């Protein structure tokens, strides 16, 4: 294709440079189940290992199937390069380890996925990397926590349970003033939000969720926006400005642009250092499965979002719903962020507070017939979970409230079924939860 494509529906099918398999002319992307690759000669092998030229060495680091997925996701996000990894959690881990070392710190939004909170609060701390938390309701809270060892900002575009859209540009601008990159987890908002367009430097995804979209494979990725100057402040980013002894003294901020002609030092370092040393590659079979999901992701996101809007309209009026949480239902500046950053929909995640507390929430979950009760989001199917008795069950009542998890709170991931069927299942389950609450009171 000679014309640059910009529409996500087309990028999902044609993004990158894959047109057909060079060996067989197959149109569908093949699964390359191989660990290693034949070198052309000894000079070629030496050059590949010395990073004097790029090519396949070992599937822990790169694979032709993964390469197609990486280029398409990079194109979808508007980035220059992408590195796939074994899970979304691995993507978050690599994003931090790529910029931080022991003694460094980074600043994260308080609105985070629980697994990421554990990673940042406990595991990163054991590595000597400090996470400082900033309330995202005021972007200036990030600036207040900066010191000379701060290496990055981190946030989620559309975090639950609050579903408050993050102020991407405002925080990115603060970061760039101090030469600090903003890393955005865009898992819950692919297609409908482009963080790189608003100043983020890196985007991470759990490809397991909406991009994969079918609850069949686990995967993650890091997208390098190519819009951050890692060499502007060498003291701020030593990982990119000091010689790397493991690669013959290579200085990543200098050698990568020289080698590739592109500002993709973040992606290259993540691939050749972190995948090399820590593993966590995405299996080619899983990459192939995610490619199948990616091809229809823009279409599914439209249906996810449209169905969620209809479900929200219904839930707001139901007598057994205390409160509905959705990006468009916030007030003031937080509501304005939805209009500013989300285009083509407001996401598939919906939070509800079921009247009657914990018991009513449990009864609602147990009464659902079409929704699946699982700890996942972003499936084509509709999903539900009651965090107070599952994902957050180890927390005290005070900790639950601080996390935004109230006794009757239920998280819904609205699928692509017919909206009438989604609403019918919610209705009968809510009616059942109300009966349960009345019996408990009586």
Regions found by a protein language model. Name each.
Residues 2-3, 14-20, 81-320:
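Conserved PLP-enzyme active-site core in the AAT-like
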Residues 301, 309, 313-316, 320-410, ...:
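Conserved C-terminal alpha-helix-loop-beta "cap" of PLP-dependent enzymes
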Residues 158, 187-189, 329, 355, ...:
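Active-site beta-loop-alpha junctions enriched in small/polar residues
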Residues 36, 225-228, 354-357:
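Short loop segments at secondary-structure junctions
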Residues 54, 80, 286, 290, ...:
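Short amphipathic alpha-helical segments
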Residues 1-56, 438-442:
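N-terminal glycine-rich, Lys/His-bearing helix-loop that initiates the first secondary-structure elements
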Residues 80, 121-122, 148-151, 300, ...:
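PLP-dependent enzyme catalytic core of the Aspartate aminotransferase-like
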Residues 36, 41-93, 115-123:
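Conserved N-terminal alpha-helix of the aminotransferase class I/II PLP-enzyme fold
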């Amino acid at each position: 294709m000679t014309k640059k494509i910009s529409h996500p529906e087309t990028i999902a099918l044609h993004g990158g440079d894959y047109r057909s398999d060079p060996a067989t002319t197959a149109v569908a992307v093949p699964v390359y189940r191989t660990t290693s690759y034949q070198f052309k000669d000894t000079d070629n092998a030496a050059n590949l290992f010395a990073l004097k030229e790029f090519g396949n060495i070992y599937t822990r680091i790169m694979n032709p199937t993964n390469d197609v997925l990486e280029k398409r996701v990079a194109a979808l996000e508007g980035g220059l390069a992408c590195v796939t990894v074994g899970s979304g959690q691995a993507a978050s881990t690599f994003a931090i380890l790529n910029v931080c070392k022991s003694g460094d710190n980074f600043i994260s939004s308080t609105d985070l996925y629980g697994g990421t909170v554990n990673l940042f609060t406990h595991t990163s701390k054991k590595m000597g990397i400090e996470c400082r938390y900033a309330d995202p309701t005021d972007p200036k809270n990030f600036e207040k926590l900066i010191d000379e060892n701060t290496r990055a900002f981190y946030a989620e575009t559309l975090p639950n349970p609050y579903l408050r859209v993050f102020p991407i540009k405002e925080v990115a601008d603060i970061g760039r003033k101090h030469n600090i990159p903003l890393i955005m987890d865009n898992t819950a908002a692919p297609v409908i939000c482009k963080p790189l367009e608003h100043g983020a430097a890196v985007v991470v995804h759990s490809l397991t969720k909406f991009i994969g979209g079918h609850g069949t494979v686990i995967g993650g990725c890091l997208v390098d926006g190519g819009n951050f100057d890692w060499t502007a402040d060498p003291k701020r980013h030593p990982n990119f400005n000091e010689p790397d002894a493991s690669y013959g003294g290579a200085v990543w901020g200098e050698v990568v642009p020289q080698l590739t002609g592109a500002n993709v030092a973040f992606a290259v370092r993540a691939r050749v250092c972190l995948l090399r040393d820590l593993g966590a590659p995405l299996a080619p079979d899983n990459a192939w499965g995610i490619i199948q999901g990616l091809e229809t992701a823009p279409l599914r996101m439209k249906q996810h979002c449209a169905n969620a809007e209809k479900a929200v309209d219904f839930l707001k009026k139901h007598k057994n719903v205390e409160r509905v949480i959705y990006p468009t239902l916030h007030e003031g500046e937080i509501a304005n962020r939805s209009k500013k950053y989300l285009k083509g929909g407001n996401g598939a995640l919906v939070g509800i507070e079921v009247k009657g507390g914990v018991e009513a929430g449990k009864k609602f979950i147990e009464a659902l017939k079409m929704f699946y009760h699982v700890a996942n989001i972003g499936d084509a199917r509709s999903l539900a979970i009651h965090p107070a008795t599952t994902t957050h069950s180890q927390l005290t009542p005070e900790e639950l409230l601080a996390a935004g998890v109230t006794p009757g709170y239920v998280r819904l991931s609205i699928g692509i079924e017919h909206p009438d069927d989604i609403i019918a299942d919610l209705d009968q389950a809510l009616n059942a939860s109300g009966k349960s609450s009345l019996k408990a009171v009586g």
